[in-house]
C-alpha cells in the first residue's frame, strides 16, 4: 500500500481551530493544542448558556411583572391567575415590557385581573 501523507488535512484542521480561537488571550490563540481545548470548552459553555438564557429571561420578566403588580396591590401569582380567568392571553415577555414602558396600560390590566378574581 502506498504511504498516506496527511499534512494538508492536518494543516486545514489546525487553521480552522486557530481561526475559531482568534481573539483569545496568549497561547489559547496561537498554540493548536491549547486552542483546541479552549474552543471545545467555549462550545460547551455556549451550548449550555443558550438554554440557560431562556430561563434567566423568564425569571427577569417574572420579577418585573411581580414588582409592577405589587405596586398596584396584587401579587404576581394572583395577577397571572386573574389574567387567565379574564381570558387575557399576554405572555410574560410582553407583560414585562408593558410594566416597564407603559405603567398606565399595566394598571388597566391589573384592574381587569382584580375584577376577574
UniProtKB/Swiss-Prot annotation:
Name assigned to this protein: Large ribosomal subunit protein bL20
HAMAP family: Ribosomal_bL20
Keywords: Ribonucleoprotein, Ribosomal protein, RNA-binding, rRNA-binding
UniProt-listed GO biological process terms: ribosomal large subunit assembly; translation
Gene Ontology CC terms, in alphabetical order: ribonucleoprotein complex; ribosome
Signal peptide feature range: none
Xref: SUPFAM superfamilies: Ribosomal protein L20
GO molecular function: rRNA binding; structural constituent of ribosome
Keyword field contains Ribosomal protein: yes
Name of the gene: rplT
Domain of life: Bacteria
Organism: Vibrio metschnikovii
InterPro entries referenced in this protein's UniProt entry, alphabetically: Ribosomal_bL20, RIBOSOMAL_L20_CS, Ribosomal_protein_bL20_C
Protein role: Binds directly to 23S ribosomal RNA and is necessary for the in vitro assembly process of the 50S ribosomal subunit. It is not involved in the protein synthesizing functions of that subunit.
Pfam family, one: Ribosomal_L20
Family of the protein in this entry: Belongs to the bacterial ribosomal protein bL20 family.
Amino acid at each position: 500500500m502506498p504511504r498516506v501523507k496527511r499534512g494538508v488535512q492536518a494543516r486545514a484542521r489546525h487553521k480552522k481551530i486557530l481561526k475559531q480561537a482568534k481573539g483569545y488571550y496568549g497561547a489559547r490563540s496561537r498554540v493548536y493544542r491549547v486552542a483546541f481545548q479552549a474552543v471545545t470548552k467555549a462550545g460547551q459553555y455556549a451550548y449550555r448558556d443558550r438554554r440557560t438564557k431562556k430561563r434567566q429571561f423568564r425569571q427577569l420578566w417574572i420579577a418585573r411583572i411581580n414588582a409592577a403588580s405589587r405596586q398596584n396591590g396584587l401579587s404576581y401569582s394572583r395577577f397571572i391567575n386573574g389574567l387567565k380567568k379574564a381570558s387575557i392571553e399576554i405572555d410574560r415577555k410582553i407583560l414585562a415590557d408593558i410594566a416597564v414602558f407603559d405603567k398606565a396600560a399595566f394598571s388597566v390590566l391589573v384592574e381587569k385581573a382584580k375584577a376577574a378574581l
